[in-house]
Amino acid sequence: MPSRFLPFTGCSNFRDLGGLPTASGALTTWGRVFRSDTLQELTDSDVKSVLTEVGLTTIIDLRTGREITNEGRGPLEHEDIAYVHLPFIADLEVHDEVPDAIERDVLADYVHMLDTAGALIADAVKAIASSPGPVVFHCAAGKDRTGILAAITESLVGVPRDVVVGDYELTNQVIDEVCARLARFDTYTTVRANPASHFRCKPEVMEGFLDLLDERHGGAAGWARDIGLADRDLAALRNVLG
């Protein structure tokens, strides 16, 4: 099986959601839906690969307005790629001033996003489903906001829970590089103040998030129904990803 990580120089966590098993026995489609950390430092070579090899048509940016103002959208802003901004957290909620990030309750953060940004998460699912070609969604590290959207998207196309959790944990393979990059930017002072190990993806966090979806909604499909996603949206998502 090909590596799910794409070997870009200017980001470390750009990876394909293809090749994941689903309940139907099929695999999710390669080369159609991607997740990533920030794209602001893509090199000229990276941009060429994104355009010619990935064939990217849509970017879904989950960062806050403040992050985008401070850090920019990166070189893909100047390309003919659709751009969708869906901030899953408010500007004041970016964890850049927490003195000890290890004390954060990450699961509580995820629940808060589900509670306060549910409509935006649903809009992101629809944006993935309606993209005319390859689409990437990203935040800063490609871990939390991106991880929630990936988990919901994968669950909606029938990827089993253990595989969803395993995909979430894949960020740990590149967390050192991701944190080293973010630590250079003043927007992310928490990353600068803590070792990369503090930001590792813990499987019990994603397990807890999926448990919550089960308890409240009977799973991701029930959440989608309750938030107002139509059957045609979910059918379109399955057609795109598998």
Regions flagged by a language model, labelled:
Residues M1-V136, I148-G242:
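Cys-dependent protein tyrosine phosphatase-like superfamily
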Residues A141, R145-T146:
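Ser/Thr-glycine-rich phosphate-binding loops at phosphate-binding pockets of nucleotides
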